[in-house]
Regions:
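Membrane-interface alpha helices of multi-pass inner-membrane proteins
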Residues: 107-126, 130, 164-166
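Short hydrophobic/aromatic helix or loop-helix immediately within or flanking a transmembrane segment
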Residues: 1-24
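Transmembrane-helix motifs of polytopic, lipid-linked glycan transferases
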Residues: 29-58
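Membrane-interface transmembrane helices that cradle and orient dolichyl/undecaprenyl
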Residues: 90-107, 143-144
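Perimembrane helix-loop-helix junctions
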Residues: 130-169
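Membrane-embedded alpha-helical segments of multi-pass membrane proteins
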Residues: 33-41, 79-91, 131
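Aromatic- and kink-enriched transmembrane "portal" helix at the membrane-lumen/periplasm boundary
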Residues: 23-29, 61-85, 116-117, 121
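Membrane-lumen/periplasm interface segments of specific transmembrane helices
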Residues: 161-197
Length: 197
């Protein structure tokens, strides 16, 4: 077995299979679920990109993802559950487009924690790239706000980025602690030490 991750997706799909008496059709349903979720997330990201910049840029963004063989090949994969890679990016983009809305920011903080937490429980692969990519839009906003000498906006963007980064790291560490606790049979330190075996 592969013990260096928790494998939430395997547990989730396994429970559903048992609930439906391991119907042979369930595998196709799970594949389609992952593909549809990825399409929804990428379409929403493209909509937000269009909202932030322009419709043409949003369309190009979507076509680029849609024609990527790498994205298409993993869309239905039950191990990668690829849509979880892009949810943190979507969250930060939504915040970037609605920075002044306090309720949106608060919802984003909570959502970011769970998005990263769930992604890490499914697998730690690419998590650094995902987190860096998530902050790209806000980082660009901060650079523009500083260039425009808009101190209030700069402070808000910086504060928002710091909080989002902090809750994302919290999601990562909570997932590691949960995984280590299980792997170490209640001994977190032992679970962390043995996490690579």
């Amino acid at each position: 077995g592969y013990y260096s991750q928790y494998g939430l997706q395997g547990k989730f799909f396994g429970l559903l299979s048992k609930a439906f008496n391991e119907n042979a059709m369930m595998l196709a349903v799970f594949h389609n679920f992952c593909a549809v979720m990825l399409a929804v997330v990428l379409a929403t990201i493209s909509f937000e990109v269009a909202f932030k910049y322009n419709k043409m840029f949003g369309l190009i963004f979507y076509i680029t993802f849609g024609l990527s063989p790498w994205i298409a090949n993993f869309a239905k994969n039950l191990y990668w559950v690829e849509f979880t890679w892009f949810v943190p990016i979507l969250i930060c983009l939504v915040v970037s487009n609605r920075l002044e809305n306090r309720k949106i920011r608060t919802a984003a903080y909570i959502s970011m924690f769970f998005a990263v937490f769930i992604k890490c429980l499914c697998g730690y692969e690419y998590i650094t790239t995902i987190l860096v990519a998530s902050m790209t839009f806000l980082a660009t906003d901060l650079i523009c706000a500083v260039a425009e000498k808009n101190k209030e906006k700069s402070k808000l963007i910086f504060k928002t980025t710091c909080i989002l980064s902090a809750v994302a790291l919290c999601g990562f560490f909570v997932a590691i602690l949960l995984h280590a606790n299980i792997k170490g049979d209640g001994n977190i330190i032992e679970g962390i030490i043995n996490s690579g075996t």
